[in-house]
Structure formats: C-alpha cells, structure tokens
C-alpha cells in the first residue's frame, strides 16, 4: 500500500511541477519587455508589417496563421520559422505558409539597431497583432520576452488543427494547449480574413463522404457560388476567402456565415452543430452595436494573449536567433 501511495505521490509531484513550470514561463512575459534594451522594437515591427501590408493586404491572414502554427507546435518559440528538410515548414499542414519574408525583414531591421536583443518569436507575436489591427480589427498589448527555440521537427506538426477535424478533436487539440472552448471559437474567428485553396474543401461540393453529393450543411445559394469559384475540373490551387462577405475586414461576419450555412471549411461549419460551440457562435453572430452577445474584438485580443503564452522558452532552453530561419 505504501509503495502505491509513494508512486501516486511521485506522479502528482511531477504533474504539479509541469503545470507550475508552464505558469512560471508564461509569467516571464511582460508588456514593454524591450522598453530599455530596444525601445523602438515594437514600432520597427509595426512599420515593417505596414509596408508589406500596403503592397499586399492578404499578408495579414498569412502572419496570423504563421503565429498560430508556431504556437501549436513546440510552443510560441519561432520554431516554425526554421528552414530544413525535416523542420516544421516541411510538414503538410505548413505547406503554403505565408509571411516569412515579413519576419525576416523585421528581424534584419532590428538587428541593425539592437543586435541580438529581440527574439524571432516575439517579432512573430507582434506582427500577428499588427496584421489584425491593419485589417480593421482589434489591437492589444502583446507581452514579450519569449526566447527562440532550437528544435523544429515536421513530425511534431501532426497536432495542428485540420479542416477535417470533428468538434471533439478540435476541442481536444485546443485543450492540450491550455485553451478552452471559448478560446477555440474565438480564435477560429480569425478566419474572417483567412483564405484557403479549393483543394481543401472541394470534396464538400462534389463528393461529400464519397456519395457524389454535396455537403447538406451548405446553403443552396452558397453552394452554387462555391461551385462557380471551384469547378470540379480545376486544379484546386485557386485561393478563396474564408469569409466571402467581408474578406479583408476583421469582423463578426464569419460567425454569421456559420449560422447561415455559408462556411467554407467543414471544421468551421461543424461549430454550429455542437451545443457548446454553437452557444459561443450565437453570441458573436447576434451582437448588435454592443447591445447583445460578446464583443468579438475584445475577446479575440484576450484569446490571442493566452495563445501566445503557450510553452514559451526561457534563457535555459532558448536563445535569440541572429537569423530567424536558422539556430545560432
């Protein structure tokens, strides 16, 4: 009996250490981390993102997705920025990632002013915030102080959310990162400025569940529209906005699309069919001039701060890379 209790206590201590370790790591982040060491850090990142945005506004969803994919694999440590045949960028879910050149540009500008000070992980977190702000979305204070990870493995990217995931699987993947159902729905609201290839949803139009029919959850009028955009004989590479109603504006229309059966991705539309996620979607979709529902812009900022604190690295297990695409 004593042996079993001893093993149980040992396991509980290990679990407690892991939980407290994550909590301590997230507390190492703070607003204005570079206020003394590199006072212009955030403004340099902002101006860099803005210059790229002015040339191509679609870079905003690319940067947001890049940050999301970084945080869900190895934590928010810039590991997705590392190049290599076996690095995260080589994983199937990461093919087509955009915005890498923006981060490299910002890093080069920062190195010229504050060499070896600002991490690539922080640049990415700041750039994601700025990309939302430039798309008429909310802005929020980004706690900084992350260090860059030294490991990037394509095999670790299997836990990234997929457009084929059920709601249960989506919930579990987010829960594994310390994010709840409210965070899940809120963060997927980023699809209001997102894009995807026809390849990732064409099956819903022509051969749903191998029946030869269309997904019945798609509204008839929207189905006609999607078939025009993505014909059955196309190569699947055409880019389609995930929120056709207001593709370049960060707003609540994405949630109204779920309500109306106008979601592009199956995983998004499924949020309407689950009672728990449906309740959150309704709160966002029904909001009218701040009188009803949740404020999506405010809640999104909170969820992003929470997500950007996932498994951050410290001086012990991280570094400040000189070049974001490779470890020092």
UniProtKB/Swiss-Prot annotation:
Catalytic activities: 2 a phenolic donor + H2O2 = 2 a phenolic radical donor + 2 H2O
For activity, the cofactor(s) needed are: heme b; Ca(2+)
SUPFAM superfamilies recorded: Heme-dependent peroxidases (SSF48113)
Active-site residue numbers: 69 (proton acceptor)
What the entry lists under Pfam families is as follows:
peroxidase
Biological role: Removal of H(2)O(2), oxidation of toxic reductants, biosynthesis and degradation of lignin, suberization, auxin catabolism, response to environmental stresses such as wounding, pathogen attack and oxidative stress. These functions might be dependent on each isozyme/isoform in each plant tissue.
According to UniProt, the name of this protein is: Peroxidase 25
Organism per entry: Arabidopsis thaliana
Instruction: List the taxonomic lineage.
Output: Eukaryota, Viridiplantae, Streptophyta, Embryophyta, Tracheophyta
